[in-house]
Swiss-Prot record:
<dbReference type="GO" id="GO:0042450">
    <property type="term" value="P:arginine biosynthetic process via ornithine"/>
</dbReference>
<keyword id="KW-0456">Lyase</keyword>
<dbReference type="InterPro" id="IPR009049">
    <property type="entry name" value="Argininosuccinate_lyase"/>
</dbReference>
<dbReference type="InterPro" id="IPR024083">
    <property type="entry name" value="Fumarase/histidase_N"/>
</dbReference>
<dbReference type="InterPro" id="IPR020557">
    <property type="entry name" value="Fumarate_lyase_CS"/>
</dbReference>
<keyword id="KW-0963">Cytoplasm</keyword>
<dbReference type="GO" id="GO:0004056">
    <property type="term" value="F:argininosuccinate lyase activity"/>
</dbReference>
<dbReference type="InterPro" id="IPR029419">
    <property type="entry name" value="Arg_succ_lyase_C"/>
</dbReference>
<comment type="similarity">
    <text>Belongs to the lyase 1 family. Argininosuccinate lyase subfamily.</text>
</comment>
<dbReference type="GO" id="GO:0005829">
    <property type="term" value="C:cytosol"/>
</dbReference>
<dbReference type="InterPro" id="IPR008948">
    <property type="entry name" value="L-Aspartase-like"/>
</dbReference>
<dbReference type="InterPro" id="IPR022761">
    <property type="entry name" value="Fumarate_lyase_N"/>
</dbReference>
<keyword id="KW-0055">Arginine biosynthesis</keyword>
<comment type="pathway">
    <text>Amino-acid biosynthesis; L-arginine biosynthesis; L-arginine from L-ornithine and carbamoyl phosphate: step 3/3.</text>
</comment>
<keyword id="KW-0028">Amino-acid biosynthesis</keyword>
<dbReference type="GO" id="GO:0006526">
    <property type="term" value="P:L-arginine biosynthetic process"/>
</dbReference>
<dbReference type="InterPro" id="IPR000362">
    <property type="entry name" value="Fumarate_lyase_fam"/>
</dbReference>
Length: 461
């Protein structure tokens, strides 16, 4: 029977053991746990709390356990309820009674919290790197299609012409904000709880700053009650992940639509599509669809953690064991989504000719014709009404703007002159030459800005 049940006269019910164990999932914290324990043992020796010999024996044993886990020879025993007890149990087997000194001036409460802080810090770094990779692929495609125009949409209706790089860089901007959020979230994870004990601190002369420095933390926690029971840093990661996955879901939706036969704006590479079990002609955008579907999974992780935390009194409660599965699943899901999306976008083949054909539909120059009338002295509101009636007429006549005669134009306003035919896709794009606009000059600047952002982040493009 585990030493933590010394208070009890009989072992836990077998069902209770299965119900309460976290070892099947929190084993993933083994590196963080061994790293924290190593730093703690070293500090205990420096402070004269345990002997140098015991400290070194503990550290040697922990290194041996790390090797066992990473080579697959470590035996995860079901009776050890979590990774922390599994490692400690094995440490006793390797070095004997000296292992019992490791937990001096430490509780599993501050131990677990510190492990998870380290995990989330690392997760933030990895997530940011994966976002940067996806940004790089978007930028590559933007640079490869500097003059490709397509319809911009509102309400899924053709609205105004934009350049493809402008569209792709919109997602670059979303992902840039995601990077900012994860960078900021990392600051809250970069605080070390170790030394807080179970809830009230510890009665030993610890050097918390020494441990924080060895573990790479920028600060130590300032309130032991808060330190062992707060999971804000997890919630912040999950919140940021939900927003990031939502951005990927939006891009997924467009890849699904754009790759359809009705649009055919893009052809997804065979490596990122699947077939049908019955329809031989199918090339399904399953990767994009799954990314869209997995967004609910990431949202679920956030909702799980918010629900776990909503009614917890200070300080530690066993409910907090439920923080790890949603965290791990979210980190994995978002990470996989970012990686697979980078590959899918990198290998996608955009179809400029199909985009150009779509621009010929939907009277995409209507706003520009209204602006033309404004330039002739008409108010915009009157111009809007004139062009709305002009569109209705063109639809009824089954004509494009370019097919209307000047006489037909002048049925709606005498301000129309021959130069109305100079209003075309190229002029519409060039006219939007303000920062943030879709004009070619602005796109060139936007690409240069994106390249600078990635270069400063250490990403080669």
């Amino acid at each position: 029977m585990s030493h933590i049940r010394s208070r009890f006269s009989k072992p836990a019910d077998e069902l209770v053991v299965r119900y309460t164990t976290s070892l099947p999932f929190d084993w993933r914290l083994y590196k963080e746990d061994i790293k924290c324990s190593t730093a703690h043992a070293r500090m205990l020796s420096k402070q004269g709390i345990i002997s140098t010999e015991d400290s070194q024996s503990i550290i040697n044993g922990l290194n041996a356990i790390l090797t066992e886990i990473e080579t697959g020879s470590f035996v995860f025993k079901p009776e050890m309820e979590d990774i922390h007890m599994a490692i400690e149990g094995r440490l006793f087997e390797l070095i004997g009674e000296a292992a019992g000194r490791l937990h001096t001036a430490r509780s599993r409460n501050d131990q677990v919290a510190t492990d998870v802080h380290l995990f989330v810090k690392n997760a933030c770094d990895k997530t940011i790197n994966k976002i940067r990779t996806l940004q790089g692929t978007l930028l590559e495609q933007a640079e490869a299609h500097p003059q490709t125009a397509l319809p911009g949409y509102t309400h899924m209706q053709i609205a105004q012409p934009v350049l493809l790089p402008h569209h792709l860089l919109a997602y670059f901007e979303m992902l840039e904000r995601d990077c900012g959020r994860f960078t900021d979230a990392r600051k809250r994870a970069d605080v070390m709880p170790l030394g807080s004990g179970a809830l009230a601190g510890v009665p030993y002369p610890l050097d918390r700053e020494m441990v924080a420095k060895e573990l790479g933390f920028s600060a130590i926690s300032q309130n032991s009650l808060d330190a062992v029971s707060e999971r804000d840093f997890i919630l912040e990661y999950l919140s940021d992940a939900a927003i990031c996955q939502m951005h990927l879901s939006r891009l997924s939706e467009e890849m699904v639509i754009w790759s359809s036969a009705e649009y055919a704006f893009v052809e997804l590479d065979d490596a990122y599509t699947t077939g049908s079990s019955i329809m031989p002609q199918k090339k399904n955008p399953d990767v994009a669809e799954l990314c869209r579907g997995k967004t609910g999974r990431v949202y679920g992780s956030l909702n799980t953690m918010l629900t776990v935390m909503k009614g917890l009194p200070l300080s530690y409660n066993r409910d907090l064991q439920e923080d790890k599965e949603p965290l791990f699943d979210c980190v994995d899901t978002l990470g996989d989504s970012l990686e697979v999306f980078a590959g899918m976008i990198k290998t996608a083949k955009f179809k400029p000719e199909r985009m150009l054909r779509a621009l010929e539909k939907g009277y995409v120059l209507a706003t520009d014709i209204a602006d033309y009338l404004v330039g002739k002295g008409e108010s915009f509101r009157n111009s809007h009404g004139i062009v709305a009636r002009l569109v209705s007429y063109a639809v009824a006549q089954n004509k494009t703007f370019g097919e209307l005669s000047l006489a037909e134009y002048r049925q709606f306003s005498n301000l129309f002159e021959k130069d109305i035919y100079a209003v075309d896709i190229k002029s519409a794009l060039n006219a939007r030459n303000l920062p943030g606009g879709t004009a070619p000059k602005q796109i060139a600047q936007a690409i240069a800005r994106a390249k600078k952002i990635l270069a400063e982040a250490g990403v080669k493009n």
